[in-house]
Regions:
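Glycine- and other small-residue-rich loops at beta-strand/loop junctions that grip anionic moieties
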Residues: 6, 36, 126-127, 152-153, ...
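Active-site/ligand-binding-proximal alpha/beta "capping" segment
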Residues: 196-248
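A glycine-rich helix N-cap at a beta->alpha junction
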Residues: 74-93
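Boundary-proximal intrinsically disordered activation/regulatory segments immediately upstream
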Residues: 1-67, 155-156
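Amphipathic alpha-helical repeat scaffolds
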Residues: 40, 129-137, 251-256
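Structured adenosyl-cofactor binding patch, chiefly the S-adenosyl-L-methionine
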Residues: 100-102, 140-144, 153-172, 230-268
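RNA substrate-binding interface of SAM-dependent RNA methyltransferases
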Residues: 4, 105-202
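Short, aromatic/basic amphipathic alpha-helical patches
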Residues: 66-77, 232
Length: 268
């Protein structure tokens, strides 16, 4: 084990945990060296299971031989930076609720056609900007039977630290890919019907048999606040509304996705 006690807060090896922004980690100028940071033994383990390559660990000293030991055994030779809890809090500026972080290399982006191969139920997220919502959507997608998640390029990044944390690492379990602007054509070519979740007078019921009996179905969710673009709704086969009560007109996109995935993530 390459254990390194933290003695210098300014060591450049610690920049990834304390000083680099998410955009700097993304490293668009040199994507082969782009990184992300995973938090907690569960999430780090899921990232390793998905084949993500670790660069270094940062953890409380007690976890080196405690709950982090099994992870470290899977990563021989990877530097492990360790210190007591109060030292790590001073370094990162926040309390490590799970006691460990792991910097990892970003995997190559998946091809959307490959992600769709063999899938029958997928989610399409149009410009979902909030990483907390994005992480929650991934967790629901994993739990409720969605085979893949497709994202437009203007939305949040599934490998932002908050998105990873909220998803409980399911961003490493559910296949996902960014889609081109003409993604409705891509889905049609793969045999998918598309269901736009939107507040429209002509919306069909969530339990409409045409949806539940579709061989392949894509559930399309829009950005926070504005929802789906009119052009997107027009390009979809169905517009679907979740029934509301007590004067509530809509749900947060993360909550709405859970309802939609539960109903539509399975065939009748």
């Amino acid at each position: 084990m390459d254990l390194r006690r933290i003695t210098d807060f300014d060591a450049p090896e610690l920049n990834v945990y304390a000083r680099l922004t998410e955009n700097q980690l993304l490293n668009r100028a040199d994507p082969q060296n782009a990184l992300f940071v995973a938090e907690s033994s569960l999430v780090i383990g899921r990232a390793l299971d998905a084949g993500c390559a670790p660069v270094s660990f940062l953890m409380e000293t007690k976890h080196v031989t405690g709950k982090g030991a099994a992870l470290l055994a899977r990563c021989p030779g990877v530097p492990v930076y360790a210190a007591e809890e109060d030292v790590l809090t001073n370094l990162t500026g926040f309390h490590l609720t799970r006691g460990m972080l792991c910097a990892m290399r970003r995997p190559p982006l998946a091809d959307p056609a490959a992600v769709l191969r063999g899938a029958t139920r997928v989610a399409v997220l149009e410009n979902v900007m909030n990483p907390t919502n994005l992480g929650a959507i991934f967790r629901s997608a994993a739990a409720l039977g969605m085979d893949a998640v497709l994202l437009t390029s203007a939305g949040s990044d599934p490998l932002y630290r908050r998105a990873i944390r909220v998803s409980m690492g399911t961003v490493f379990q559910v296949p996902w890919a960014y889609v081109p602007e003409d993604w409705p054509a891509l889905l049609r070519a793969q045999g998918f019907r598309t269901a736009a979740m939107a507040l429209r007078d002509d919306s069909v019921r969530l339990d409409d048999p045409r949806l539940t009996q579709a061989e392949k179905l894509a559930v399309v969710m829009g950005t926070e606040g504005d929802g789906l673009a009119d052009a997107t709704i027009a390009a979809c086969d169905f517009t679907v509304r979740i029934p509301m009560h007590h004067g509530v007109d809509s749900l947060n996109v993360a909550a709405a996705s859970a309802v939609a995935f539960y109903q539509l993530g399975r065939r009748a």
